[in-house]
Curated annotation (Swiss-Prot):
This is Beta-toxin Cn8. It comes from the Eukaryota. The keyword Secreted applies. It comes from Centruroides noxius (Mexican scorpion). Expressed by the venom gland.
Amino acid sequence: KEGYIVNYYTGCKFACAKLGDNDYCLRECKARYGKGAGGYCYAFGCWCTHLYEQAVVWPLPKKKCRA
């Protein structure tokens, strides 16, 4: 599974500025989803890879982004 990291409180994606390989996104993906996860900046959001099937990613059902 793959997807954007989501902030459970705001319903928004984790933003990033440096596209492609991105230490911030990689660190956040691993912290949220475990050591096996990968991550990079895609379309100015942190995109995580190698997630378990039940991982919660953006968009959250019935919750719009409220920054």
